[in-house]
A protein has these predicted regions:
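Surface-exposed loop/edge segments in extracytoplasmic proteins
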Residues: 362-371, 403
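Sequence/fold signature of self-assembling virion shell proteins
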Residues: 2-40, 45-54, 152-179, 183-186, ...
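Assembly/oligomerization interface modules of large self-assembling protein complexes
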Residues: 18-102
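Short, surface-exposed loop motifs enriched in S/T, G, D/E and P with embedded aromatic residues
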Residues: 247-252, 368-374
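Alpha-helical scaffold segments that mediate packing/assembly in large oligomeric complexes
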Residues: 105-190
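Surface-exposed, short loops/turns at beta-strand junctions within beta-sandwich domains
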Residues: 382-389
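Aromatic sugar-binding surface patches on proteins
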Residues: 373-381
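Structural beta-strand segments of beta-rich domains
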Residues: 337-343
Length: 407
């Protein structure tokens, strides 16, 4: 059986130049739609400079009459020490690495040097680390058991700071089934704070959306009766924009399904420089990347130890909408005279209260509304009525927004 036994170890300068720096810079990092900070001085600080006001003055005489300096906003990003580990059977590992090598046309298979093998092994591990970092920076929660729990992600931090004051993140609710993607993007722009809209000429604004919103927006563009839309439908689009602002699919749908406490659909309009991912391998002891073969288990193992974290800076530079709270009936349908109702609702960490109301066939209410109680997304209660045809659920979010569904 073929196997790869040579150990590889990266630390110090090699850890940066060979492994992490290529992964956290360039077009791939830009495509994330956020700011990526690698090995910035500790403590890692996200900074944003606000342009100074009017600095012109009447010239009356020589001398100095300096105005106010530009305002600097800063926020320290908390870094967590994380460990990435992967293990493969010797045979599977060899096959994966060999496939990476043979897939390149510039490789001489009769003369495979150690450099070729090392590059293939490194690429395999870097891809896994980059994907884990990307998913965690959006959906991470240190209070969660299991996956994506190494550091708190953007979604948890933003939802925790939603509110109505100028120091809160503006977040509204939306029903993906009842609102087009174009209307949602327009609403985010219309409801954005003036300071955020003023940054549009700088070219750093971006829409960050989940895959369902991105796909629906692309379908809406395909439906436009223009030759350009028809050609784009055939040839595909390199990227989507709304009024000149890029729309980026953050591609976390597979992970969201395993995080039922989070809204399953969301979109935000922000400045790229307002959200930052920080990774550090230079200022903490023990950071390294190792790849070795374990002969006792006949297994190839990979390990990386580094610091990572993410945060946003200014709430006034965020306009957000959360959705995907579609209820699922887990009890028997409520009869005409009422009965026990039980529903499962995703995104429960952002839900304040759920109210149920019986509705007759003619649309009139039947009986008194009741507040459903429950935990971890399952809500229940008992409805009473005389001619209930369906049940209307009102989901009130923690920021005061409300959504209505029928079950």
């Amino acid at each position: 059986m073929a196997k790869i036994e040579n150990p590889k170890n990266y630390s110090g300068r090699e850890l940066e130049t060979i492994f992490f720096r290529p992964m956290l810079s360039g077009p791939d990092a830009r495509a994330l739609g956020i700011k990526v900070m690698y090995n910035t001085p500790v403590p890692t600080t996200l900074q944003f400079w606000k342009r100074a006001g009017d600095i012109l003055q009447k010239y009356t005489a020589a001398g100095w009459k300096g105005g106010d300096a530009a305002t600097k906003y800063s926020k320290q990003i908390a870094l967590s020490k994380v460990k990435a580990e992967a293990g493969y059977s010797a045979e599977d590992y060899f096959n994966m690495v060999y496939e990476l090598i043979t897939g390149r046309p510039d490789v001489n298979l009769d003369d495979l040097t150690g450099t070729e093998l090392e590059a293939a092994e490194t690429a395999l591990f870097k891809e896994a680390i980059a994907e884990s970092i990307r998913a965690t920076m959006w959906l991470g929660d240190t209070e969660r058991e299991g996956a994506l729990s190494t550091f708190d992600g953007f979604l948890k931090r933003l939802l925790a700071d939603t509110g109505d004051t100028e120091n809160d993140v503006r977040c509204t609710g939306f029903d993906p089934a009842g609102e087009t993607a174009e209307k949602l993007l327009k609403r985010l722009w219309d409801e954005a704070p003036d300071v955020l809209r003023a940054f549009k000429p700088q070219g750093e604004l971006v829409y960050l959306v989940t895959s369902d919103i991105y796909a629906r927006y692309e379908e809406e563009l395909d439906g436009v009766a223009l030759e350009a839309a028809y050609l784009a439908k055939q040839n595909g689009r390199e990227g989507l924009s709304f009024r000149g602002i890029p729309v980026i699919d953050i591609q976390v749908a597979p992970y969201l399904r395993s995080c039922p406490e989070l809204p399953q659909s969301f979109a935000l309009l922000t400045d790229r420089r307002n959200l930052a991912l920080a990774v550090n391998t230079a200022d903490f002891p023990g950071t390294e990347v190792r790849m070795w073969y374990n002969p006792d288990q006949m297994e190839n193992r990979q390990r990386a130890v580094f610091m990572a974290g993410c945060d946003y800076l200014l709430p006034e530079l965020v306009s957000m909408a959360a959705g995907g709270f579609d209820p699922e009936l887990v009890s028997e349908p409520v009869g005409a005279s009422g009965g026990t109702l039980s529903v499962r609702i995703p995104g429960y960490s952002f839900i304040g209260q759920v109210t149920a109301q019986g509705v007759k066939a003619d649309g009139k209410t039947d009986g008194e509304p009741i507040a459903l109680s429950g935990e971890k997304g399952t809500y229940g209660g008992t409805l009473a009525g005389t001619a209930i045809d369906r049940v209307r659920l009102t989901i009130e979010l923690k920021n005061g927004a409300s959504l209505e569904y029928t079950v």
